[in-house]
Curated annotation (Swiss-Prot):
It catalyses: (R)-4'-phosphopantetheine + ATP + H(+) = 3'-dephospho-CoA + diphosphate. It is found in: Cytoplasm. This is Phosphopantetheine adenylyltransferase. Its EC number is 2.7.7.3. SUPFAM superfamilies: Nucleotidylyl transferase. GO terms for biological process: coenzyme A biosynthetic process. It comes from Synechococcus sp. (strain JA-3-3Ab) (Cyanobacteria bacterium Yellowstone A-Prime). The lineage of its organism: Bacteria, Bacillati, Cyanobacteriota, Cyanophyceae, Synechococcales.
């Protein structure tokens, strides 16, 4: 069964990677799909994020990385995915994700949403937090995979 793990991943964190690794054990194929959102100004381009993720998941043979725009359910159908995987860090994530799952179910009744609780050691990590710490020159190696840490250091050089 194919699962889709969509997100902005700007940048991918160890929390995201935890969800990807666990989903890869549950499904025959996991597609990590980087959303191209024209309404947002990301730090990294979709192609840069795709490259970061590819390097971070190279050890997972059943994980593919792609980019997409538009409705997640339309992309899931196009790729033959039957499940949308979502990670939950804190209770407030559940509120937003449940609303999205209900909306997706209305749009595509054949798709299921699977919520995976992020490992406790990653429950505080968000892409926004990582960018803020990197911007202020703080340590990030415990928050993101090495290729991402390198890209962040290049983006926010210490002065």
């Amino acid at each position: 069964m194919i699962a889709l793990y969509p997100g902005s991943f700007d940048p991918i964190t160890f929390g995201h990677l935890d969800i990807i690794e666990r989903a890869s054990r549950l499904f025959s194929k996991v597609i990590v799909a980087v959303l191209k959102n024209p309404n947002k100004t990301p730090l990294f381009t979709p192609e840069q994020r795709q490259a970061q993720i590819l390097l971070s998941v190279a050890h997972l043979k059943n994980v593919e990385v792609d980019t997409f725009s538009g409705l997640t359910v339309a992309y899931a159908r196009q790729r033959g995915a039957r499940v949308i995987v979502r990670g939950l860090r804190v209770l407030s994530d559940f509120d937003v994700e449940l609303q999205m799952a209900h909306t997706n179910k209305l749009l595509a009744p054949e798709l299921e949403t699977l919520f995976l609780a992020t490992a406790s050691e990653h429950s505080f990590v968000s892409s926004s937090l990582v960018k803020e710490v990197a911007k202020l020159g703080g340590p990030i190696d415990h928050l993101v995979p090495p290729p991402v840490a390198q890209d962040l250091r290049e983006r926010f050089p210490l002065t």
